[in-house]
Swiss-Prot record:
UniProt-recorded name of the protein: Carboxy-S-adenosyl-L-methionine synthase
Organism field: Pseudomonas putida (strain GB-1)
PANTHER family: CARBOXY-S-ADENOSYL-L-METHIONINE SYNTHASE, TRANS-ACONITATE 2-METHYLTRANSFERASE-RELATED
Role according to the record: Catalyzes the conversion of S-adenosyl-L-methionine (SAM) to carboxy-S-adenosyl-L-methionine (Cx-SAM).
GO molecular function: carboxyl- or carbamoyltransferase activity; S-adenosyl-L-methionine binding
Length: 247
């Protein structure tokens, strides 16, 4: 499957619509996220490594907000616990269709991968099976803020003792100087990856009402309120971070 360069915002738009994960985004998503999220490949590959430590036999491993299945593929490559299966969930029909294609291609290249089920569903309404690993890779930031605690509480209830939630998010910072610095460094990262000022500005307009990042402290406080006993930051690159939350 060919991967197209992200040129979605390269031409001036009279009105910039809110960002949605539609077919246009799906076509360029691998290029978009690689050029927009510093550290993304490192997070994805190591999610599988981390999951292998917490995965337990005969349990579910969830990839919530699976998009094109990069995390699911990492889980399948690294986890070897008997009887595990991956449940990849996304609410975008276009993402789910392409995700299934990528996973079929992975099956043709590798043997003895974990079985996988791909669901087109709203994770806010999803009934969770007993799970040893739940991955949310840049997903919670697209959930309405007043619905995040309830979702995390349900995930906590589904997690078995010894399991883990691995949560990756874009961060904002309470300190104004820190926020401004890391925001500018992130823009420099995008410029270095070939995005023009027009593309950066229009993408920001499209996503600012859709993605609502939290501070690290807000994440830690919410996870504790949801019933997690320990929250361990394991990765940060600029204003993007990943946490391990233990039940």
């Amino acid at each position: 499957m060919s991967k197209q360069p992200d040129r979605l915002f390269a031409q001036p738009l009279e009105q910039v619509p809110d960002f949605v994960f539609n077919e246009d985004v799906v076509r360029v998503f691998p290029d978009m996220i690689k050029r927009s999220v510093p550290g993304y490949p490192t997070i994805v590959e190591n999610l599988g490594v981390l999951a292998a430590r917490f995965a337990q036999p005969n349990t579910a491993l969830y990839d919530l907000g699976a998009s094109l299945g990069a995390v699911t593929q990492s889980l399948r490559r690294h986890v070897r616990s008997d009887g595990c299966r991956v449940i990849a969930v996304d609410n975008s029909a276009a993402m789910v269709e392409r995700c299934r294609q990528y996973l079929t291609a992975q099956d043709s290249m590798f043997q003895e991968l974990l079985p996988v089920q791909v669901l087109e569903a709203d994770i806010l309404a999803l009934p969770f099976e007993p799970a040893s690993v739940v991955a949310m890779n840049f997903t919670l930031q697209f959930i309405a803020p007043d619905q995040r605690l309830e979702l995390l509480g349900r995930i906590r209830q589904a997690l078995l003792p010894g399991g883990a939630l691995i949560l990756s998010e874009k961060l904002r910072f309470a300190d104004e100087q820190e926020q401004d610095l890391l925001n500018e460094l992130h823009l420099d990262f995008k410029r270095a990856n070939g995005y023009s000022e027009l593309e950066i500005a229009q993408k920001r307009s499209a996503i600012e009402n859709v993605m609502r990042p939290d501070t690290l402290e807000a994440h830690q406080e919410r996870l504790r309120a949801a019933g997690f006993s320990k929250v361990v930051p394991w990765f940060q690159c600029l204003n993007f971070a990943s946490l391990i939350a233990l039940p």
